[in-house]
Structures are given as structure tokens and as C-alpha cells.
Amino acid sequence: MAVDPETGEVYWAFDLVTDYGYAPGRRNNTNTPLFYNGEIFTTSGYDAEGVMLKLSPDGKSAEVKWHNGALDTHHGGVILLDGYLYGSNWINNGNGNWVCLEWDTGKVMWEEKWYNKGSIIYADGLLYIFEEKQGHIGLLEPSTEGFKLISEFRLESRSGPYWAHMTISDKKLFVRHGEVLYVYDIGKS
């Protein structure tokens, strides 16, 4: 949606749910859209396709540049890195794969099963992924050539989904699950 900041006039609005599929009865808009170079990528899981919008130079109109069902991120976020999107998709509430798409075209570079869908962050040249069902954390080399897992570990077993997003500060990886905050030193020794 684009709005005139002075008058409140709506220039344009986009309904991802209505226009690009959705599992019946589901509404899930938990991902922050990504803006780059006059374009917006948005996704929201439950089979709503990921959609790239191209804005007019004045921002008062937008049109769909491409759409792709391979990256319909449930609630784990998406990373834009060097012209490629990385994230996980929603197959159903129990399953999802990890995906890399080309920003300009929506072309699927790869799609890989790794435990389950989840959240993703980027720091110091690496992707950190956290799957939501069993608490596995993986370290990935960003690549358009395939899913390149460097290492992985699993959080101590606890009940419930692993939905919190990780964060990194001062060479420490912070991971919350329930009432527990895990802190891992990820600095080079």
C-alpha cells in the first residue's frame, strides 16, 4: 500500500491473499516486505505465492513483475543478498523446504529439504537458519549453486515450536525458546 503522507490518499494497494492464493481460512502476514531498487518482494505462507512488485518512479503505482509459489515464507523472514532471496517455504504446517530465488526474475536457483521450515538471518558472510519443529540450527554458505550446509547443531529438547528469530550481537548468537535464552560465542578463535 502506498499513501500520500499529507492527505492520506491511497495511491495503490495490493492484496496478496486474494490475488495469489491462500489456504482457506488462513491469513498470515508476519514477514516484513523487502524493498530494493524500486521493487518490493512480499510473501506470507499458506500457499500465497511470493510476489515481486515494480513501483513507478514516483511510487504512486505498482504492478506485478513476477510471482512464484516456491518461496511462500510462513513466518521466518527472507534475506536479500547479492541479488538473491533466501528463506523457507510452507508446504503445510508440518513441512517446508529452504529456497533460493533470483531477485530479478523469481527463478528458483535451488530448493532443499533440511528438517523443516523456519527462520533465517545473515551475518559476517553466512546464513543462519533455525528450523521450527525440533530446534536445529544450521550455518550455510550463501550460494546460488545449492544448499551448502557448513555445520549444524540442535538446541536442548524442549516442547513447543521454535518460532523465535535468532539475532547476533557482538559475535554472539542469541536464540530464545520458551523462557530460555541460549547464547553462543560465534567469534573466530
What would you call each of these model-derived segments?
Residues M1-S189:
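Noncatalytic, solvent-exposed loop/strand surfaces
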